[in-house]
Amino acid sequence: EEKNAKLNSLSYFDRQTEINWTERGPNEQGGRTRAIMLDANFANNGRVWAAGVSGGLWYNDNIDSQTNPWTKISDFWDNLEITTVASDPNDANTIYVGSGEKVGSAGIGLGMWKTTDGGSTWSQLTSTTGYRFMGDMIVRDESGTSAVYIGTGRALHEGQYDGINGLWKSTDGGATWTEMLGEISENS
């Protein structure tokens, strides 16, 4: 009942109510931001993550401050076309990022990366190197097991189609994947 009340309160939008947005960066350096995520430890560390398809991966530890700087993870991420970021609901220190933007074949990705220490170190998930274009990702708690779902696409790149199309699921931290829905039409 409480959940339904919360959902219902979100479903009504008064068009007369003005919403004011305040820019928080990363300024002139983050590229086009494609993904944003509140850190799973946000209540304790205030961290917000931002991922850009041409600017890398960033975090800010005080998003409420207009002067608090964004920290770039490393120059390595600049050209990876980061398109999605998600945290593990069962382990606040585990975060996944996906790469590759299918829209207009803007940038081929190199799969997914994972951190298990809150973002200090990252490892490429070699099981995902064929996933060239990632549309979205979510990590869900399924009866105590963290299930990672990713939507991947195939797109025309250098004259031929590249990538693996479908909806995929991993229950072992990205070591292996099960196809949930594959071979989606190129025009879907």
Give, region by region, the residue ranges found by the protein language model.
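Extracellular glycan-interacting surfaces
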Residues: 1-188
